[in-house]
Amino acid sequence: MDTFFESAWYAARFAAQPNDSMLGEEADHWLPVDHYIGGIEHAILHLLYARFFNLLLRDQNLIQASEPFNRLLTQGMVLADAFYTKDENQNPEWISKERVNTYKDKLTLDDGREVFKDGMSKMSKSKLNGIDPNIMIEKYGADTVRLYMMFTSPPEQSLEWSDTAIEGSYRFLRKVWNLISKRKIYAKEAPQEFTKAELNLRYKSHQTLKEVTNAFAERNSFNTAIASVMELLNAVPDSFKSDDATDSEQYCLDEVIRFTLKMLSPITPHISLFLWKEYSGSDGTDFENSWPIFNEELLKLENFQLIIQVNGKVRGKEIISVSMGQDELENLAKENENVKKILANQPIKKVIYIK
């Protein structure tokens, strides 16, 4: 049979155990498919066939699901620079970038032939502009490659591959490693009181967990989820990471570490699980079978984040009480360390307050 015919209903057949009947009860247990991921071309080909066959199977009482898929994600393409030279008939002859020599902005081959840059285009065998994943994984590790691809672009948009930009993802995972690898889990009871700085970090931790949970479950916004985790780690004060940290500071840092490893685990599973085992001393079963729950009460604290801009650019952020008035907020903004450096005692010409 044609592959379109077979693939149009394979989800129902694969859900059932091998038996004499075409479909078993297992199909009704697993269907419909939670998430369909495929290129945009599937929207006018495979999805139409699949929906037709699903309705046919339903009408024949072979399955109960009215629709074959609950959600659809049409992923973008991975792009990379493509290069070519010309044969004797001036036709393009595609070459891999490894063969290209650069000298004073001129591209050539070893034999002296001129090389032309075609720009970013979809990775393909015909244009020889693909990236060998094994080389990248051997150099950076699978987690770094996965993190880079998820962070660089929303999944439904094209991703422009860069051998240099992936270094940023590698450095971030090194930062995570350096923060957690030599620490052990905080095993004491939760403190009864917290300082303002500690409450600010706890607020940030639970706010980030809420954002990331929603990004994964509802929006497929993997890039914004990763950005939120990066922002959380940047928000940890140095004193919380020092050997002299108080019990309450250690507790807040422990919360950051727990949340960070879980939030990264769908994208960087290897380093996340390894660090959790080292950090917690467990076999990892608890890590793989649970997802943390953000504390709504902490998020309902009478606090909000004050965004401080100077000449239209964000220069500072502060978690403050909603009871503070405009004069208090202005004074707080002026005392922000980064803002003070930028102002350098210059007079402020205009203050815009937006509540």
Per-region residue spans from a language model:
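Structured secondary-structure scaffolds
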Residues: 1-181, 203-238, 255-264
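Active-site lining segments that contact anionic ligands and/or coordinate catalytic metals
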Residues: 7-8, 69, 142-145, 258, ...
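NTP/phosphate- and nucleic-acid-binding module
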Residues: 19-20, 191, 306-355
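Residue-level preference for well-ordered alpha-helical positions
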Residues: 58, 137, 265, 276-277, ...
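Short secondary-structure junction motifs
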Residues: 64-67, 272, 283, 346-348
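Acidic, turn-prone loop/beta-hairpin segments
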Residues: 72, 78-88, 96-99, 187-211, ...
